[in-house]
Amino acid sequence: GSVCDGTGWTPRHILLEQDGVPIAAMPLYLKNHSSGEYVFDHSWANAYHQHGIQYYPKLVTAIPFTPVTGPRIGIANEINPDLIEQVLLKNIKSLAKKWGASSWHILFPRYGLLNSIFSQSLMKRVGVQYHWKNHNYNNFDDFICTFASRKRKNLLKERRKSTENINITRLVGEEITADWWEFMCSVYHQTYLKRNGTHGYLTHK
């Protein structure tokens, strides 16, 4: 698989129970690299190395290969989320020490969880993402009508050129044969090989 010991994502997920009943869970991985996170901390790893300190392994709470903000702790409806977050965050430091991890990183958490993190004297690292937002456009024409005439004309010209001699077929469910999956994997791996000399994050499995 793509997320396992063999790919450097060793599962260490946390489950909280009350009287034998699960009430909360948090994804957690012990990692020996920084790939697949879309948060680039290689400069931190280099700084650790230059000072003779081990940066890996590290603990990471994240949805692998998904740079999207969202919940990172699943909590039962009847349970106080603030209490659960405090319990998990208080114990994460001891778990990092137990497993020999240099640090714990929670990637793209929801904003409410950030307040709990700050209360535990943990550091915040701010990144920047650029998002396109739909300002009540009903279709693509509505969107490009907001462009200046010259830019709109150039965009339409570029779109026409990009689709010349190209046929697009949409496949769903059982229409996607093993051969198509094999082709998709080969294209995926070739793209990464051209980009950075690796095979990418996802495996055939």
Q: PLM ranges: what are they?
A:
Residues G1-Y55, K93-K205:
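A conserved beta-strand-loop-helix scaffold within acyl/acetyltransferase catalytic domains
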Residues D41-Q86:
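A gly/proline- and charged-residue-enriched helix-loop-helix capping module
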Residues V87-I92:
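Long, well-ordered alpha-helical scaffolding segments within enzyme catalytic domains
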